[in-house]
Amino acid sequence: MSEISSCATQNHPKHATFEAALDKYRTKIAPNLCITGPLNTVELSNIVGLVTRERGEVPIVFIDYLQLLACGVTADQQFIDERLAITACVKGLREISNLYGSPVIALSSTTRKSYDSGKSARPNLAMFGGSSAVEYGFDSVLYLADDNDKPEWPYESPATGTPLKLVALKNRYGTLGESRLDFDGARATFHDRG
């Protein structure tokens, strides 16, 4: 972060690049973002509908994360039972996707049990906490895990960042598989180690 803040000073050699990136963010990215506090799926659906009507484009909905989405009647009325709340959230997100054709990407926690099982057993759909609705309600489920496996090929280059693997646990319209990645934390990017 200190490199970024130092680029903001006018005498820094990367200042022009920093200003260009900032300008691109201001003109292209920021006007297309809608970051909100806790919402229920009805309120979220209203926002998606408004964006679709005003912009003439269907937005992509990112939920960070599913267990924090407010799924009561209003944003401040949560269900008492977490399983019912998660089931209602998944159902509401599916309705938004079906109604507007909007892709929905939701982050979800996993059960505490799965923290240990992820080290030895293959990840599976049962590891998502709270409700089986996560298993059945989404078209695709991806899991990001540490990659402590041996290289698949003898000529595979070693990891240059944090070695991870992205595992497709469910893919309603395609095949399952995994991809080996490097995570570059300083740049918040993933690179395929394929």
Residue ranges, per PLM feature:
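P-loop NTPase motor core
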Residues: 37-165, 173
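Generic structural "secondary-structure junction" signal
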Residues: 6, 71, 127-130, 183-185, ...
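Cytosolic-facing regulatory segments adjacent to core modules
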Residues: 1-57, 128, 179-180
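Generic preference for hydrophobic/aromatic residues in regular secondary structure cores
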Residues: 31-35, 142-144, 181, 188-190
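NTP-binding/hydrolysis catalytic cores, primarily Walker-type P-loop NTPases
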Residues: 168, 173-194
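Short, surface-exposed, polar/charged, turn-prone segments marking secondary-structure boundaries
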Residues: 13, 131-135, 193-194
